[in-house]
């Protein structure tokens, strides 16, 4: 169920704040955005990417020197949508700290590793999975060939970025991503996808 569907069912909790000027209610995600916390929950697609990118840009405009926390619980999804988030994370001035809560797979794991080095975290029972780019082209043989070349170029691009983000040799990343490669939180730390596994706030 997407966040939009949950919102449609009225299942997103509301937070009521009281001040000298009266009372104000926020949905929980808007309230957390005030604390510079962004969530990516569910599939990475154009809609979720647009929401995340907009929030990143908004928080940069609010304070370009204060970190942004990016919580990820995602099975992955669209490469182009994920790369829009990745590029924005690198483009903006604030450091983006990432945290895996639950599951970060495919593009979800890629974005987890894209956080500021030293500020990439996972909860202890989270799982992380990396693999190669998936594609499905239909149509004339010539068009399929064009798409295949593009997928191979994208695969190479993502492997190079993942090698740089993790510190692993490119050949190891290529080999490990040939098939679904599952890691525990501690294994993800050893691999370089995250920097620390956190059980409790300090």
Curated annotation (Swiss-Prot):
Record keyword Transcription present: no
UniProt key word Lipoprotein: no
EC number from the UniProt entry: 3.4.21.92
Species, as recorded: Variovorax paradoxus (strain S110)
UniProt cross-references to NCBIfam families, sorted A to Z: clpP, PRK00277.1, PRK12553.1
Function: Cleaves peptides in various proteins in a process that requires ATP hydrolysis. Has a chymotrypsin-like activity. Plays a major role in the degradation of misfolded proteins.
Gene expressing this chain: clpP
GO-annotated molecular function: ATP-dependent peptidase activity; ATPase binding; serine-type endopeptidase activity
Chief localization: cytoplasm
Protein name per the record: ATP-dependent Clp protease proteolytic subunit
Keywords: Cytoplasm, Hydrolase, Protease, Serine protease
Gene3D superfamilies the record matches: 2-enoyl-CoA Hydratase, Chain A, domain 1
InterPro entries, alphabetized: ClpP, ClpP/crotonase-like_dom_sf, ClpP/TepA, ClpP_Ser_AS
Compartments, as annotated in UniProt: Cytoplasm
One GO CC annotation: endopeptidase Clp complex
UniProt xrefs under CDD domains: S14_ClpP_2
Reactions this protein catalyses: Hydrolysis of proteins to small peptides in the presence of ATP and magnesium. alpha-casein is the usual test substrate. In the absence of ATP, only oligopeptides shorter than five residues are hydrolyzed (such as succinyl-Leu-Tyr-|-NHMec, and Leu-Tyr-Leu-|-Tyr-Trp, in which cleavage of the -Tyr-|-Leu- and -Tyr-|-Trp bonds also occurs)
Summary of subunit composition and partner proteins: Fourteen ClpP subunits assemble into 2 heptameric rings which stack back to back to give a disk-like structure with a central cavity, resembling the structure of eukaryotic proteasomes.
Active-site residues (renumbered): 106, 131
Family: Belongs to the peptidase S14 family.
GO biological process: protein quality control for misfolded or incompletely synthesized proteins
Superkingdom as given in the UniProt entry: Bacteria
């Amino acid at each position: 169920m997407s966040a939009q569907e949950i919102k449609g069912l009225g299942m997103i909790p509301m937070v009521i704040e009281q001040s000298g000027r009266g009372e104000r209610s926020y949905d929980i995600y808007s309230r957390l955005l005030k604390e510079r916390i962004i969530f990516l929950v569910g599939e990475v697609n154009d809609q979720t990417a647009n929401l995340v990118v907009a929030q990143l840009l908004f928080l940069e405009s609010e304070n370009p020197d204060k970190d942004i926390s990016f919580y990820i619980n995602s099975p992955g999804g669209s490469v182009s949508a994920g790369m829009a988030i990745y590029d924005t994370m690198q483009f903006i001035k604030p450091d983006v700290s990432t945290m895996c809560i639950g599951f970060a797979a495919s593009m979800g794991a890629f974005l987890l590793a894209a956080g500021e080095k030293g500020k990439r975290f996972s909860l202890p029972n989270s799982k992380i999975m990396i693999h190669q780019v998936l594609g499905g082209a239909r149509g004339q043989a010539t068009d399929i060939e064009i798409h295949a070349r593009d997928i191979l170029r994208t695969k190479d691009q993502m492997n190079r970025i993942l090698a740089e983000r993790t510190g692993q040799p490119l050949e190891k990343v290529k080999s490990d991503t040939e098939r679904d490669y599952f890691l525990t939180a501690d294994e993800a730390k050893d691999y370089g996808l995250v920097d620390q596994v956190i059980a409790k706030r300090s």
